[in-house]
A protein has these predicted regions:
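Exported/periplasmic ABC-transporter solute-binding proteins
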Residues: 1-19, 25-27, 32-42, 49-52, ...
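Central helical "cap/lid" subdomain
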Residues: 62-68
């Protein structure tokens, strides 16, 4: 069985598939680019996306049999510790014009789309942040993230930016890394990232059922993801 999955699922995938009885071959990448590959005719049995829009588009185009949400996520800031000042919060860091802000690429990667939604929710201040933010990962022509590295850690430690906007599911791992600080973004500013799967072939139905099982949901949530809001 072949799965194309959002890159943010890579860290949980091995433990998630351990109880599943069938062999699964998974390839990870920005969900928007994976959707384009499926639309262009690439084969897979199941597509796991970091948003609902891409699976729904495949369903509407007749390329998927069913769509179901299975997890959710939020955003957080990761910053180089030396730029953090006592009293700083997410808003003060994003609006400090001397700091370079990095995101993933909107359109190609839902993480970048959620960052754009964050800027919109910030109102007028967010428009200035939007103009300053640079999409440094997750695009067609982005530099590849080195194997075994997280985007936030790689971008910040390589000196490309001082602030990275990414998924909160990485937060616990990033907090353990030297020189980095993770900052929470509160509601109502923080968008909810709804993860969903598109069942492409009937052979994927057992995997779809498994992903919604109590056992699988426990593994996903232990990895820093949130439950999916049921529609």
């Amino acid at each position: 069985m072949k799965v194309l999955a959002a890159g943010s699922l890579r860290t949980v995938w091995t433990s998630l598939m351990a109880p599943f009885p069938e062999p699964v071959e998974a390839e990870f990448g920005p969900a928007g680019l994976l959707r384009e590959r499926i639309e262009a005719g690439e084969f897979c049995d199941l597509f796991a996306s970091a948003n609902l829009a891409h699976p729904r588009a495949l369903l509407a185009a007749g390329r998927a049999l069913a769509v179901f949400p299975f997890a959710s996520n939020q955003l957080c800031l990761t910053v180089r510790r030396e730029v953090w000042r006592k009293g700083d919060d997410w808003f003060s860091l994003l609006t400090r014009e001397t700091l370079r802000i990095a995101t993933s690429t909107p359109g190609a990667d839902p993480s970048g789309d959620y960052a754009q939604e964050l800027f919109t929710r910030m109102g007028a201040a967010g428009e200035s942040v939007r103009r300053r933010a640079q999409a440094l990962v997750g695009g067609r022509d982005s530099a590849p993230i080195p194997p075994g590295r997280l985007a936030a850690e790689w971008i910040l430690h390589s000196g490309k930016a001082e602030v990275f906007i990414g998924y909160a599911s990485y937060g616990e791992t990033l907090r353990q890394m030297e020189g980095l600080k993770v900052i929470t973004i509160p509601p109502p500013y923080n968008p909810l990232a709804n993860y969903a799967c598109a069942v492409i072939t009937p052979q994927a139905q057992p995997l779809a059922d498994f992903l919604l099982s109590v056992e699988a949901q426990k593994i996903v949530q232990q990895a820093g993801f949130l439950p999916s809001p049921r529609e």
